[in-house]
Amino acid sequence: MARKAKKKNISSGVAHIHSSNQNTIITFTDEKGNVIAWSSSGKVGFKGTKKKTSFAASEAAKDAAQMAKEHGISQVRVEMKGLGSGKDSARKQIEVWGIKVTEIKDVTPIPHNGTRPPKRVLKRLRLKK
């Protein structure tokens, strides 16, 4: 059984929103990167294709924001990553829970002609043209 986390008094932190095609994960950290609270669409109770919806992302953000509020977080810097549909709804839900958003940053990694993609990805890219 995991031990209960101590209540921390942290006024500001970073909210990381990772939104993929299948799931949305929200993590609240302090400025150093230590995790304070986290939640995901799957943790909240959504299964299968329902995890990728924006409603599931907002419910996960509500759960994570509630835990972060208990640790004293009042303002965050939001870093969003990924191409999923739940990024904006998760950010809005964080604001609804009374946590002030000071900065919004998109940190989605974009390759600048890196390694060659697998054959199936190349086929998909050719079909789109």
Curated annotation (Swiss-Prot):
Record-level Gene Ontology MF annotations: rRNA binding; structural constituent of ribosome
InterPro entries associated with the record: Ribosomal_uS11, Ribosomal_uS11_bac-type, Ribosomal_uS11_CS, Ribosomal_uS11_sf
Cited Pfam families: Ribosomal_S11
GO BP term, example: translation
Protein name: Small ribosomal subunit protein uS11
Chain positions covered by the region annotation Disordered: 108-129
PROSITE patterns per UniProt: RIBOSOMAL_S11 (PS00054)
Domain of life where this protein originates: Bacteria
GO cellular component: ribonucleoprotein complex; ribosome
HAMAP family: Ribosomal_uS11
Subunit details: Part of the 30S ribosomal subunit. Interacts with proteins S7 and S18. Binds to IF-3.
